[in-house]
Regions:
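Generic hydrophobic transmembrane alpha-helix motif, especially the helices
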Residues: 108-110, 134-166, 230-243
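Membrane-cytosol interface at the C-terminal ends of specific transmembrane alpha-helices
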Residues: 47, 146, 172-211, 237
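N-terminal signal-anchor/first transmembrane alpha helix
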Residues: 1-62, 68-79, 88-89, 95-102, ...
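Short hydrophobic alpha-helical segments within the ABC transporter permease transmembrane module
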Residues: 194-198, 220-233, 237
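Membrane-interfacial helix termini and adjacent extracytoplasmic/periplasmic loops
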Residues: 145-185, 249-262
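Glycine-rich helix-loop "coupling/hinge" segments at transmembrane-helix boundaries
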Residues: 64-67, 71, 170, 247-276, ...
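Non-cytoplasmic
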Residues: 155, 188-194, 232-257
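Glycine/proline-centered hinge or cleavage motifs at structural transition points of membrane proteins
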Residues: 213-214, 227
């Protein structure tokens, strides 16, 4: 009797626990269904807006379609992709794009983190400081690019005058440096804003406890602040990297892609709107889309485990 009673009494909590888990599971499923229902309208609109251009671009990339000879359009399969990938122009454009992306995003991350910490820690004139920092980001990119172009114009530009009327936009290396500088000046504030939001996720109690334990400011930053900021870092780096990889306006205004400064977006634009070759231009666009998808996948794999709502 004792054994049976023991079995019964030890079995009841297990049954109750299983029922409780089942109820939680049903509640979680209901919450998930509600989430999908709330997201569905936006997803439908996004698919309607984005799906047709994407599939139409894929279809064009499989055609020999030159607007100068529209009657000669025909299906040629993946020949356009072969032509693009075997062209030195594509690989040069990809190399230039990667240089601009890696350098600008790396510098923006460091400067953005410093600005984020400064804005987050500043108690006085915090609103004024944030407004000043965000001014460059609020300026239209084309207008800012024309400002940079004027500043580096020999005999008239103030920055050119500081360097003995130099003309950096006429040489590949210095032109890329000016383009990267324009990118950094424009979008560091965006990076700082996202990282500052991440700083608010770090509990002050942890910082105080680490300070009491004798941890230095650098140790607290490396072992507490950065790990807890990973979700914000993912968003900041992902958004900014994808934006930098598609760089177009600064290059178009400053150099128009001349002197070997053309990016993959400039190359696609030239083929689509100047050469009127929709087949090659669409193939370049799809390759850019694939590169962007690969970059997004890499970032999510590297930082995704730290994002809210993910496990392990």
């Amino acid at each position: 009797m004792t054994a049976e009673t023991e079995a019964v009494t030890t079995g009841e909590p297990q049954v109750t626990e299983r029922k409780h888990r089942k109820r939680l599971s049903e509640g979680a499923r209901a919450e998930r269904r509600l989430g999908w229902m709330l997201c569905a309208p936006a997803v439908v609109v996004m698919i309607a807006v984005a799906a047709f251009p994407i599939f139409y671009a894929i279809w064009l990339s499989l055609q020999r379609y030159d607007l100068r000879f529209p009657n000669e359009a025909k299906f040629i399969g993946f020949s356009n992709y072969g032509a693009v990938l075997s062209s030195p122009y594509w690989w040069h454009a990809l190399w230039v794009t990667l240089i601009i992306t890696v350098v600008s995003v790396a510098v923006e991350f460091v400067l953005g983190m410093l600005l984020a910490i400064l804005m987050f820690r500043t108690l006085f004139v915090r609103g004024t400081l944030r407004t000043i920092v965000l001014i460059p980001y609020g300026i239209v990119t084309v207008a800012a690019a024309y400002g940079w172009q004027y500043a580096w114009t020999p005999n008239t530009g103030y920055l050119s005058a500081l360097f003995n009327n130099s003309a950096p936009l006429t040489k590949t290396g210095t032109a890329l440096a000016v383009i990267i500088l324009a990118e950094i000046w424009k979008t560091t504030a965006f990076m700082a804003l996202l990282l500052m939001a991440g700083l608010s996720l770090v509990p002050e109690d942890l910082q105080k406890a680490a300070r009491v334990d004798g941890a230095t400011a650098w140790q607290r930053f490396i072992r507490i602040t950065l790990p807890l900021m990973k979700p914000a870092i993912l968003v900041a780096l992902l958004f900014r990297t994808l934006d930098a990889f598609r760089v177009f306006d600064n290059i178009y205004i400053l150099t128009a892609g001349g002197n070997g400064t053309y990016s993959v977006s400039i190359l696609g634009y030239d083929n689509l709107f100047r050469a009127l070759n929709l087949g090659i231009g669409s193939a370049i666009s799809i390759l850019i889309f694939i590169c962007v998808a690969i970059i997004a996948f890499i970032f999510i794999r590297l930082f995704g485990a730290a994002a809210p709502g993910t496990e392990g």
